[in-house]
């Protein structure tokens, strides 16, 4: 007897199926396909198992498919059993039935081009009632009747509904669906319904009934724009009392509490109002209240404001001049304000022009002026106007003083002596004529260019070209919010921590993008130092469309936290800066960190394994990475700091191959793929979390130790994803069952033992970071230094057409890899030796052995050679 088993598609979460076991009948059925067992209808209880069987006769190794409601059953266990050579039985097992499993089932098999179908069976799943309509939350006025609805279905039927008001039964029994009529409530009340059938009962969600009330008083009332007759007002509405606000009233008075106040009613939203026809230069006060269906709110506080005044409305009268031996005395009548809003007068403004082009403007206190700086041999034209703090009034009629007159006369300049206006008129005419000629010339050019193309269209009397109005743009530079910590809306405590590390935006220049994610990005930048030199840094910033103050505060708290750290294996803060933005938008906060040339540790490990030019990382290097991280975490734990997000992606690799613990919060925004949202909570890196963190949201230094164990596993696997093939939602059940990450290939037993200790279910049984550091340093000390002859970083390529000694791929002479053509700063590089067409592969174009370095003592070690010597322990390496 042969047995063939097939399950649902891997990777899909299996449904909980249910059913009633049917009997296997003796295999004496007629040739063909049939459903075994007698029932055409099956009824099972929710949660019970069921097995459906069908028989196939006269076929060798048939491919039996089970169908439900016309679709292939994929998420259930299916077994094919061979009774004899051409007699097979197909078995469908449903372990625990749910309502969704009810339906019409049959099996089918292909016989050449023909599909044979068995008889079908209808599966009914019975259980406690299922709610299709539950009572909803409501906000109602006091003592106003309302209704609540409830509906539940079987099978089995019938379903009976009972209503509850808090702990008291208030209605039922009634058939489903049911409506409860409530005469009204006077306080917050909860209602729920119960559904009963012969299988049991189910209770609906509670419906919370809240009382509506008049709204609260508005606040933040602000007069935003003021002119001489208008004022714009804006405010923030108070709590709406669970009812829609329909209008607000703005009350305006000359003094707070004045009886004769102007009231303006405006529909809302928006919560703004334009007050018109106000008196100029007048003190006012205003207040606002809003209303909903239950009534108005109290008024907000009185807000005083003053309208602007008016410029003088009249020109000075009786403007005349008297010649004297010492000069020219000018006199005019005082301007009396016609409107109280004009305010106090300032000095008068006197303007004069002579025929020779000389002109000037004087400010005169009083109504008399003595003009001495003028040429009596030339005609003189004068004007005067009144002014105040608001502006200038209208000019008087021109006063012409002729070179032949002994006194000036007010009126139009004389034609014989006033040639200046004539010149101005001629110039105006010339400019106008030139403009018209230019317009005609451009029009003619367009007609010449497009005339032939549009002749047929114009002949029909149709418009040749249709234009649409373009957008208009404001060429003025938009207003910018000053980039200060006060403009971000963060707490005073956080501002105090960041004030001494705030760096002006002008002090650095942003460069290329290093990485970005759902909420933020990292960019390279050049920071100008006090001595004028520049240093390369990394700048983390939120996205431009992130404007919530909570996101900004969380982002900057990471910087405030890093400010306190001082350890070679913990990322240290360089500073914080703010990037100004136009259109009144909040500045973008930026956290400035040291630039780590090799990026994050996870990306480096991944490149060593599956990059364009993979390279080997010796075991000493991998253990050294672990020692560095343990040193950094030992320092953090000694300062009572809990990281909560330790992973290879959150460790940075410096130029000298030392590892720094970093990313105290922002990393989950950059690497959002490793995070999972549980319910309404924030996204969590569940595959790095300890059991107590997953179960109780509890984070301690012991949970950081668990994450360190997962990070060690990442390092030993060169960046593989932990728990591959297991969904985030299934991690807790996987771990609570006693499962842990498997020992990676080529991982030392001592290293894996340390990992496994980190994953103890009892947090107190996990080792401390001090213990981990000491054990790892002990392991590192016992590892032998790899000789360069055994170092798999090097692959010698023979001449073109000849196989390499180690069986590696061949490259012809002169051929370059893509990395050689670059600047040599990538993960892999190739250095050519023209004499024997021999290539050396390494993480960065390294020399083949230290001996080759000695042959060229005058050449300094390049970056890649230094990396190899660091990995082999031939250069000093920073330690704890």
Curated annotation (Swiss-Prot):
Its main location: membrane. PROSITE patterns: FN3, IG_LIKE, PROTEIN_KINASE_ATP, PROTEIN_KINASE_DOM, PROTEIN_KINASE_TYR. One of its GO terms (biological process) is negative regulation of lymphocyte activation. The modification Phosphotyrosine is found at residues 671, 675-676, 794. It catalyses: L-tyrosyl-[protein] + ATP = O-phospho-L-tyrosyl-[protein] + ADP + H(+). Residues 441-880 are cytoplasmic. The chain crosses the membrane at residues 420-440. It is found in: Cell membrane. It holds the Pfam family I-set. Residues 852-864 have a biased composition (Polar residues). It comes from the Eukaryota. Keywords: ATP-binding, Cell adhesion, Cell membrane, Disulfide bond, Glycoprotein, Immunoglobulin domain, Kinase, Membrane, Nucleotide-binding, Phosphoprotein, Receptor, Repeat, Signal, Transferase, Transmembrane, Transmembrane helix, Tyrosine-protein kinase. Residues 31-118, 129-210 form the Ig-like C2-type domain. Residues 804-827, 842-864 are annotated as: Disordered. ATP binds at residues 514-522, 540. Disulfide bonds join 54-107, 150-193. Residues 508-785 form the Protein kinase domain. Residues 1-30 form the signal peptide. Residues 217-310, 315-406 form the Fibronectin type-III domain. Monomer and homodimer. Interacts (via N-terminus) with extracellular ligands TULP1 and GAS6. Interacts with PIK3R1; this interaction increases PI3-kinase activity. Receptor tyrosine kinase that transduces signals from the extracellular matrix into the cytoplasm by binding to several ligands including TULP1 or GAS6. Regulates many physiological processes including cell survival, migration and differentiation. Ligand binding at the cell surface induces dimerization and autophosphorylation of TYRO3 on its intracellular domain that provides docking sites for downstream signaling molecules. Following activation by ligand, interacts with PIK3R1 and thereby enhances PI3-kinase activity. This is Tyrosine-protein kinase receptor TYRO3. The lineage of its organism: Eukaryota, Metazoa, Chordata, Craniata, Vertebrata.
């Amino acid at each position: 007897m042969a047995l063939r088993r097939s399950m649902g598609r891997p990777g899909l979460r299996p449904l909980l199926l249910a059913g009633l076991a049917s009997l296997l009948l003796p295999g004496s059925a007629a040739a063909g396909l049939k459903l075994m067992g007698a029932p055409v209808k099956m009824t099972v209880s929710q949660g019970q198992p069921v097995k459906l069987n069908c028989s196939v006769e006269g076929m060798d190794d048939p491919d039996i498919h089970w169908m439900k409601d016309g679709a292939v059953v994929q998420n259930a266990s299916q077994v094919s059993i061979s009774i004899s050579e051409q007699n097979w039985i197909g078995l469908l097992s449903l372990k625990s039935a749910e309502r969704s499993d009810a339906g019409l089932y049959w099996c089918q098999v292909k016989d050449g081009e023909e599909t044979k179908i068995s008889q079908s069976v209808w599966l009914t799943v019975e259980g406690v009632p299922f709610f299709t309509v539950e009572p909803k939350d409501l906000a109602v006025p006091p003592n106003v009747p309302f209704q609540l609805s409830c509906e539940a279905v079987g099978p089995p039927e019938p379903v009976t509904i009972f209503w509850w008001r808090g702990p008291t039964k208030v209605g039922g029994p009634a058939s489903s669906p049911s409506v409860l009529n409530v005469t009204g409530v006077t306080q917050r009340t909860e209602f729920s319904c119960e559904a009963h059938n012969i299988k049991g009962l189910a209770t609906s969600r509670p419906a919370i009934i809240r009382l509506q009330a008049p709204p609260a008083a508005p606040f933040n009332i602000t007069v935003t724009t003021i002119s001489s007759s208008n004022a714009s007002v804006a405010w923030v509405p108070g709590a709406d009392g669970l009812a829609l606000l329909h209008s607000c009233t703005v009350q305006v008075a000359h003094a707070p509490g004045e009886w004769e106040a102007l009231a303006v009613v405006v529909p809302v939203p928006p919560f703004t109002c334009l007050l018109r026809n106000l008196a100029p230069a007048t003190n006012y006060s205003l207040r606002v209240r809003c209303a909903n269906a239950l009534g108005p709110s109290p008024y907000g506080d009185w807000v005083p404001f003053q309208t602007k005044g008016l410029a003088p409305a009249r020109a000075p009268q009786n403007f005349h001049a008297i010649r004297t031996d010492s000069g020219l005395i000018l006199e005019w009548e005082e301007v009396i304000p016609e409107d109280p809003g004009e305010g106090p007068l300032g000095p008068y403004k006197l303007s004069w022009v002579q025929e020779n082009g000389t002109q000037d403007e004087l400010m005169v206190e009083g109504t008399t002026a003595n003009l001495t700086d003028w040429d009596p041999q030339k005609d003189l034209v004068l004007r005067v106007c009144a002014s105040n703090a608001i502006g200038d009034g209208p000019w008087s009629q021109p006063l012409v003083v002729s070179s032949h007159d002994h006194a000036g006369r007010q009126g139009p300049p004389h034609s014989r002596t006033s040639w200046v206006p004539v010149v101005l008129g001629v110039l105006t005419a010339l400019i106008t004529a030139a403009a018209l000629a230019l317009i005609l010339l451009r029009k003619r050019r367009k007609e010449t260019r497009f005339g032939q193309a549009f002749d047929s269209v114009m002949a029909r009397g149709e418009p040749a070209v249709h234009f649409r109005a373009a957008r208009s743009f404001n060429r003025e530079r938009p207003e910018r919010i000053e980039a200060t910590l006060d403009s971000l809306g963060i707490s005073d405590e956080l501002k105090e921590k960041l004030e001494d590390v705030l760096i002006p935006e002008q002090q650095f220049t942003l460069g290329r993008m290093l990485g970005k994610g759902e909420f933020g990005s990292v960019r390279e930048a050049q920071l100008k130092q006090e001595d004028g030199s520049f240093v390369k840094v990394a700048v983390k910033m939120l996205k431009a469309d992130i404007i919530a103050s909570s996101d900004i505060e969380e982002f900057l708290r990471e910087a405030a936290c890093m400010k306190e750290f001082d350890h070679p294996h913990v990322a240290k803060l360089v500073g914080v800066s703010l990037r100004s933005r136009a259109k009144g938008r909040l500045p973008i906060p930026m956290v400035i960190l040291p630039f780590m040339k090799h990026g994050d540790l996870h990306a480096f490990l991944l490149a060593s394994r599956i990059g364009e030019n993979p390279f080997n990382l010796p075991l000493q290097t991998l253990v050294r990475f672990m020692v560095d991280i343990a040193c950094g975490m030992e320092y953090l734990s000694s300062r009572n700091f809990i990281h909560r997000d330790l992973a290879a992606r959150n460790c940075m690799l410096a130029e000298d191959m030392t590892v720094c613990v970093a990313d105290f919060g922002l990393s989950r925004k950059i690497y959002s793929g490793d995070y999972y949202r549980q319910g309404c909570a924030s996204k969590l890196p569940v595959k790095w979390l300890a059991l107590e963190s997953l179960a109780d949201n509890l984070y301690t230094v012991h949970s950081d130790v668990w994450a360190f164990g997962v990070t060690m596993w990442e390092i030993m696997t060169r960046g593989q994803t932990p728990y591959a093939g297991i969904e985030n939602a299934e991690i807790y059940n996987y771990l609570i069952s006693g499962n842990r990450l498997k020992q990676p290939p080529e991982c030392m037993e001592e290293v894996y033992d340390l990992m496994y200790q980190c994953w103890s279910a009892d947090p107190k049984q996990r080792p401390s970071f001090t213990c981990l550091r000491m054990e790892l340093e002990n392991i590192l000390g016992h590892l032998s230094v790899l000789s360069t002859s055994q170092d798999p970083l090097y692959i010698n390529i023979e001449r073109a057409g000849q196989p390499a000694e180690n069986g590696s791929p061949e490259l012809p002479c002169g051929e370059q890899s893509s990395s050689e053509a670059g600047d040599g700063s990538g993960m892999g590089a190739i250095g050519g030796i023209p004499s024997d067409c021999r290539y050396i592969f390494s993480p960065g174009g390294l020399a083949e052995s230290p001996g080759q370095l000695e042959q060229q003592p005058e050449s300094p070690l390049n970056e890649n050679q230094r990396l190899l010597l660091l990995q082999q322990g031939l250069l000093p390496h920073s330690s704890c």
